[in-house]
Amino acid sequence: MDSKQSSELVFTVRRQEPELIAPAKPTPRETKFLSDIDDQEGLRFQIPVINFYRKDSSMGGKDPVEVIKKAIAETLVFYYPFAGRLREGNDRKLMVDCTGEGVMFVEANADVTLEEFGDELQPPFPCLEELLYDVPGSAGVLHCPLLLIQVTRLRCGGFIFALRLNHTMSDAPGLVQFMTAVGEMARGATAPSTLPVWCRELLNARNPPQVTCTHHEYEEVPDTKGTLIPLDDMVHRSFFFGPTEVSALRRFVPPHLHNCSTFEVLTAALWRCRTISIKPDPEEEVRVLCIVNARSRFNPQLPSGYYGNAFAFPVAVTTAEKLCKNPLGYALELVKKTKSDVTEEYMKSVADLMVIKGRPHFTVVRTYLVSDVTRAGFGEVDFGWGKAVYGGPAKGGVGAIPGVASFYIPFRNKKGENGIVVPICLPGFAMEKFVKELDSMLKGDAQLDNKKYAFITPAL
């Protein structure tokens, strides 16, 4: 279940000077506005992704750096907004100045083999800051490259493709669509199989805007007791949930909820264990935000090539005492209801709220955010060397407020079991408690009753 894969592996990465890759052909010079779903405070950050690839003798010694560089330039002809820069207009409205300047690219070599990373590639990755170099001056939201890509050759002939995205531009499906296009061009295509669609106006606020749904996810919650996660002493660990672990969690599911999804039961369990580990006061509100892809919730559905942000943050809210003292079914009911809240009207209401309330950040105080990327397809991206050994988020806890978010990433362990790996980021004291609580549940010896969690007292 628990992976202690660490950053003990040390190696040297030698980088070339960063360069800008511009579109291979002239592209329109224009201004394109982001949608009111893209343009929210909680997405104004850079999100890191990493893919590992084995050597493939059928590639005949081709250089992955040169192949991918050329493919990026060709792909940017179609995705030319990525080659531009963001700027703000009236009321902080974000827009892309399509300048054609290009995306940031770093070529590198590492004196390490893929095998040395171990037989279970998963976050946290050693020397991540060397595999995805933070080029000075590149990490801002405005007037900076919208993508930073580093390709690192490995001693064994494999390579690592790492990417950092300005999240206001795309969500996971949109980013994978772009990466897939780069892979197709790298393999000789003349155009992506799915052509990009901008159409960000589809997710703009109405005129006049009117908030028609309840949005607890954007409530302003004062951090009266200093319960925002401290940024020092943060520990990163990953946890694997295969058939055995999921079955163990399902033993706590009441009969009327037996049709719940793996996402739902896993989210309920992790939210509960995490809340116990950080020890909020019993009367304080705690939240779990579930990222829900809303593409299929529209009628008609959003165009298949749409690569903007098209998700919502529906939230379940309760008190720490209720969450921790009730059986798992209590949290599970809350999570199930939360996911069903997202409709076309809900998305329109969020867009309207952004305009009315000044594009607020989602609530982070005593909040846990989960994002399921098991079907996103990061690992399917093929530049000619086959599918990735690992493909997905580079670490947990990313975001404007570190430590809040976890990703559910598809994973096969060394036993050959398919499952989900979840990177968790917590302060050291909380991580120890989290591991004990989760281990207790998985061993089936957790007594989910009122006595078990009596440690939560007003004195804390």
UniProtKB/Swiss-Prot annotation:
InterPro entries: CAT-like_dom_sf, Plant_acyltransferase. It comes from Petunia hybrida. Induction: Circadian-regulation with peak levels occurring during the night period (11 pm) in flowers. This is Benzyl alcohol O-benzoyltransferase. It is an enzyme of class 2 (transferase). It comes from the Eukaryota. The active site is at 167 (proton acceptor), 382 (proton acceptor). GO terms for molecular function: acetyl-coenzyme A:acetyl alcohol acetyltransferase activity. It catalyses: benzyl alcohol + benzoyl-CoA = benzyl benzoate + CoA; benzyl alcohol + acetyl-CoA = benzyl acetate + CoA; 3-hydroxybenzyl alcohol + acetyl-CoA = 3-hydroxy-benzyl acetate + CoA; 3-hydroxybenzyl alcohol + benzoyl-CoA = 3-hydroxy-benzyl benzoate + CoA. Involved in the production of volatile organic compounds (VOCs), including floral volatile benzenoids and phenylpropanoids (FVBP), in flowers of fragrant cultivars (e.g. cv. Mitchell and cv. V26), scent attracting pollinators (e.g. the night-active hawkmoth pollinator Manduca sexta). Acyltransferase that catalyzes the transfer of benzoyl and acetyl moieties to a large variety of potential substrate alcohols, and involved in the formation of volatile esters benzyl benzoate and phenylethyl benzoate from benzoyl-CoA. Disulfide bonds: none annotated. Pathway: Aromatic compound metabolism; benzoyl-CoA degradation. Disruption phenotype: Decreased endogenous pool of benzoic acid (BA)/benzylbenzoate and lower methylbenzoate emission, but increased emission of benzyl alcohol and benzylaldehyde. Increase in the flux from cinnamic acid (CA) to coumaric acid and to flavonoids. Delayed flowering time, large flowers and anthers, delayed anthesis, as well as large and dark seeds accumulating abnormal high levels of flavonoids and anthocyanins. Greater internode length and stem diameter associated with an increased lignin accumulation. Fewer first-order lateral branches but longer primary roots.
